[in-house]
Amino acid sequence: MTSIHEDTHIGYAKLTIRSLERSLQFYCNVIGFQVLKKTDRQAELTADGKRVLLILEENPSAVVLPERSVTGLYHFAILLPDRKELGIALARLIEHGIAIGHGDHAVSEALYLSDPDGNGIEMYADRPRSTWQRDREGNYVMTTTAVDIEGLLEEAGDERKTSLPNDTIIGHIHLHVSDLKEAKAFYTDVLGFDIVGNYAGMSALFVSAGGYHHHIGLNIWAGRNAPPKPTNASGLDYYTVVLPHQEELDLVANRVKHAGYSIEETENSFRVKDPVSGAYITFVI
């Protein structure tokens, strides 16, 4: 198998929501994004004023489905540069009265919440890569224990911010899929991501580029053979994967076409439908 380039990373996610005004209040005031560009029905959000991290598109008639009922978004994950910034974000969430879940995953500390349309969000900070451990099979050792909430808040101290730091990125995307075997074939054999977590006991598979703990999480927690998200539902429409140069874009596109998947190409991007989550992936440089 040919691995995807080590400098590959997630770009942004595009979501359908029901009310742009309500969502902007949440994503800007609570999460800390800034509006980069806005029309009547769509907004592009950023942390640094330059790079798009999230696109919201309004569909007032969009249906909000019960959790874990279809394939598609489990959560998109906002990666903060350090533990202090995660603590500052936590304090902001608490001040706004947001319901928060949390998990210490050994490689990272994470907070979990949902937007007004039920789209899952993770806000997290990585621990130093030198501390990440792998088991005998090469899987990263990832746990789910309680985050030291008091310690996070102590890290933040009295510092409060209304916006995300400039070097915030989308660290990973986690998807409900219909079949893990097919997901493995598509994401590893076709796209070229490396398996970094084959967690059969928890019905999940984590893949990445360049040794990261995961750029894409895949699970069957909505049920094996779960149906795809209807087109009239809120949720993830597509996400982007950023490749370092045109040569890599051509290599990945050729692998996808050779495997029999249809793609939509432009001069410096292509789009393919993920057969197991129903979301589209746009590869860009």
Curated annotation (Swiss-Prot):
Catalytic reaction list: catechol + O2 = (2Z,4E)-2-hydroxy-6-oxohexa-2,4-dienoate + H(+)
VOC domain mapped to chain residues: 9-126, 169-285
List the GO molecular function terms: catechol 2,3-dioxygenase activity; ferrous iron binding
Q: Note one Pfam family from the annotation.
A: Glyoxalase
Keywords on this record?
Aromatic hydrocarbons catabolism, Detoxification, Dioxygenase, Iron, Metal-binding, Oxidoreductase, Repeat
CDD domains referenced in this protein's UniProt entry, alphabetically? VOC_BsCatE_like_C, VOC_BsCatE_like_N
User: Per its Swiss-Prot or TrEMBL entry, what cofactor is needed?
Assistant: Fe(2+)
Choose any GO biological process term that the UniProt entry carries and state it: catabolic process
| UniProt EC number | 1.13.11.2
Indicate the family of this protein. Belongs to the extradiol ring-cleavage dioxygenase family.
- PANTHER family per the record? CATECHOL-2,3-DIOXYGENASE
Function statement: Involved in the meta cleavage of catechol to 2-hydroxymuconic semialdehyde. Essential for growth and viability in the presence of catechol and probably involved in the detoxification of catechol.
What protein name is recorded for this chain? Catechol-2,3-dioxygenase
This protein's gene is called catE
